[in-house]
Amino acid sequence: MEAKARDNNYYTVGMDLGIVKLNGFDVFLFGTPGLLRFKVMRDVIVQGTDGIIFMFDAAHPDKDEDGIIILNAVRKLLMPETPIVYLANKQDLAGARHPEVVRSQNYLPPDAVIFPTSTRTGENLDEALKYIVNQIYENYSSILKVLRIYESDIEGLAKNLDKDKMEMRDLLNNLEIKRFIDIDRLSRTYKVREGMKLLM
């Protein structure tokens, strides 16, 4: 979100929230500004995130230094298995750097996935979103298989996962918030939601 200041320049003043439906599931996208002063906002949003789409401004290498500071701060808060996909944005502009140049100049690992994108034209945005959702699905696929077996036996699930009552409550509540399962608290059962599969 940007606002025009008295000096006629536009400045970032807030965050964006988007919801996209994929395979019947709502994917919540929280867009935080790429400015250092929004650290507190990023720290709050990163808690509980399932994946990160990190955008580099491919047309303005002078913004990379702040970008790397932000990326490193975010990485420290993430669980190790949390996937990150990178975007080399503004490919619609003349002189925009190729994704491999962005990778090299920012010391991203060789296996990091980086898409050439343009938020203005929509280039590769769907592909990047599908990629990160697939990575998230792969992270959850093993637990979803186990959950399907124990839908009417929470105690059996707790035993299988070696979790106590509080840990089970937290796990199931978290999965319900993320809309992977629906909990029936009266019957003390849950149901894994249909539709979870890899996106092509």
How should these model regions be labeled?
Residues 92-142:
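Canonical P-loop GTPase G-domain recognition
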Residues 179:
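Glycine-centered, phosphate/nucleic-acid-interacting loop/turn motifs that mediate DNA/RNA or nucleotide
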Residues 166:
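Key DNA-contact positions within bacterial/archaeal DNA-binding proteins
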Residues 139, 151-153, 183-200:
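Short, cationic-aromatic polyanion-contact patches
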